[in-house]
Amino acid sequence: MAKEKIRIRLKAYDHRILDQSADKIVETAKRSGATVSGPIPLPTEKTVYTILRAVHKYKDSREQFEMRTHKRLIDIVSPTPQTVDSLMRLDLPSGVDIEIKL
């Protein structure tokens, strides 16, 4: 397992929870003896929704809402079996989406 690389991609709407989760993952991986690269901030995805304020007419009166998705990338270059085991047992907040690729 020494030649493999684990790529962890994190997504969340709140950047503070995302950074806390990334720090927790990096700390756990370093404690188990793996080499860690990251967290690397990826571009923030911004989705804008425009709706009409009025129900029937007044199309000039609109309101815009936006949703920002913050992303981070963590590469674990030389994972040990202990690293994989400790990452599986790691408890992270519910607002963070995690993708793990081996």
From Swiss-Prot:
InterPro entries: Ribosomal_uS10, Ribosomal_uS10_CS, Ribosomal_uS10_dom, Ribosomal_uS10_dom_sf
Superkingdom of origin organism: Bacteria
PANTHER family documented for this protein: 30S RIBOSOMAL PROTEIN S10 FAMILY MEMBER (PTHR11700)
S-S bonds: none
Lineage of the organism: Bacteria, Bacillati, Bacillota, Bacilli, Bacillales
Subunit structure of this chain's protein: Part of the 30S ribosomal subunit.
Chain's role: Involved in the binding of tRNA to the ribosomes.
Family: Belongs to the universal ribosomal protein uS10 family.
Gene Ontology biological process terms in this record: translation
One Gene Ontology cellular component annotation held by this UniProt entry: ribosome
UniProt source species: Bacillus anthracis
Keyword Ribonucleoprotein tagged: yes
Keywords from the UniProt entry: Ribonucleoprotein, Ribosomal protein
PROSITE patterns named among the record's database cross-references: RIBOSOMAL_S10 (PS00361)
UniProt-listed Pfam families: Ribosomal_S10
GO-annotated molecular function: structural constituent of ribosome; tRNA binding
NCBIfam families noted in UniProt: PRK00596.1, rpsJ_bact
Protein name as it appears in the record: Small ribosomal subunit protein uS10
